[in-house]
Amino acid sequence: YSLNKLRRDLEILYYFYLEISARKTAKELNIDYGVVHRKFMQFRKLIAEYCNKQARKLNGELELDESYFGGRRKGNRGRGAKNKTIVFGILERKGQIYTKIVENVSAETLMKEIENKTKKGSVFYTDGWKSYASLEQYGKHNIIDHDKELVDKNHNHINGIEGFWSFAKERFHKYHGID
């Protein structure tokens, strides 16, 4: 590994840290886009591996929700989830979050993730989606009815995870998605 390659990779890492796109980084540094794109993918993979190694079961007050990622389809009416990526998330109000791409939002799929990633006895907040019906076996289940109010007098809400979805979608939009 040469000193020049190390210097180049550190410059690419700096642009990655600044959240500058791979295309713009390649142009700014006068480096082939393919090289920059591969490095960005390596950085993302390393971050994901690090996060997985640090993972622990979430506990305490947990907000659960699912979200659909993917661009709007021209000609399709409504919000349809067809051809979109489903992401399930668990937000621990103390600060950690777990997300995973899932094939569907069935009870079997979501409850498996909940069982594997949360400690029994936690307090769960959901939007009342039918797949969460058996959540009581893992802890206290509070259902949030957005039709009534966003936050009730007992601070029951899922605003944290919904804010995270908004943040994530804004980030992915900036990069036109992430491979």
Spans of features found by a protein language model:
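Residue-level recognition of single "structural anchor" positions
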Residues: 1-179
